[in-house]
Amino acid sequence: DVYPTFAEQYTDETVQNNSLVVECGERSRFIDYDDIYVQEANMYSYSYSTSFDGEGAITSAIDYVTTEDLPQLYVLEGHGEKDLPENFKEQIEKENIETNTLFLLNVDAIPEEADVILIYEPSSDLSEEEVDMLYQYAEDGGKLLVMAGPTQDGTLENLYGLLENYGVETCEGIVVEGNRDNYTMQPHILLPEMSSNEITDSLIEENYYPNMPISQGMIINDESG
């Protein structure tokens, strides 16, 4: 290599040939070759497929280095929440969303810069004080993304009470699908049909098929929220 240490100012990773660096001002984004040509394993057929995502990776990098204020996602903690899946974290990074953690019991208010608060699979319920803070945050225009389901220790009464303000009522038990077209392997591992909107369009375009195992039942009240 002509400049063997050039990439060290941009990344700590081992740099492969044909990797890229996008830079603008004080910001930069390293694009690994494996993020340009993405290899995925099919565990059912024991085969691998390779797809080209260079356009998506470069577009994301350009957006990152040229955007002054990036969206701020705060991930709630303190209730035995599970770690975010790696593919989910990778997608968040690709969308240039910065992540932070949020522990509500030692703050007086939710940070003003929080664009979205994510509640991901808590194993214990939120306190009434925490729910009040989240409710006020949402009333002031904040956004909540809640991914929660059945827990071993019972229901998440306070959290589900918060959701009822927005027309979502939970049911006891899990959803079991009777239509073979809408589950994989077992009737409790759901294959949802995705409608087109700004959240799901990228999944549809890239031919992702999310599965939802052990899903909590919900009743949607159109008259609420």
Set out the residue ranges of the language-model regions.
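Short, surface-exposed patches at the edges or C-terminal ends of soluble domains, predominantly
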Residues: 1-225
